[in-house]
Amino acid sequence: MGEMPFWKMKSLEEMSGAEWESLCDGCGLCCLNKLEDWDSSEIAWTSIRCTLLDGESCRCRDYDNRQATVPDCIQLTPEAVREISWLPPTCGYRLVSEGRDLYWWHPLVSGDPETVHAAGISVRGRTVPEDDIDIEDYEDYLVTWPLEVGREPAE
């Protein structure tokens, strides 16, 4: 019987830098532009991606320096994970902070970074870059798929 995975044994605060980074499944959902209703505080997702998000790999093109280019980019910390209401329901950070397990398609479980895409979780092929969209047109790009959990593995 194997050793229990680190995300089941450690709190977010106890994780090493490498363990913390590996909780990211590479879906790209957190890098989508979101709209917030000022009255209700409800969050609406768009299919508009951050200027730095690669639409195919679903990874940041300049991760280490992203906040220099995108000053409002959110740096996730254990505290931020617990406070940010818009993290997708499939987010590894959110799941672990809530004491839940990772989904089968998470690369830490599957051993394959492509399963997040095969399961239909990632933004791959479903987004447009924010540089191409006028902010007044963002409502034309509202989507609900970031709130879906994805497909089960094929038998």
UniProtKB/Swiss-Prot annotation:
InterPro entries: Puta_zinc/iron-chelating_dom, UCP006173. It comes from the Bacteria. Belongs to the UPF0260 family. NCBIfam families: PRK05170.1-5, PRK05170.2-5. HAMAP family: UPF0260. This is UPF0260 protein Smed_0627. It comes from Sinorhizobium medicae (strain WSM419) (Ensifer medicae).
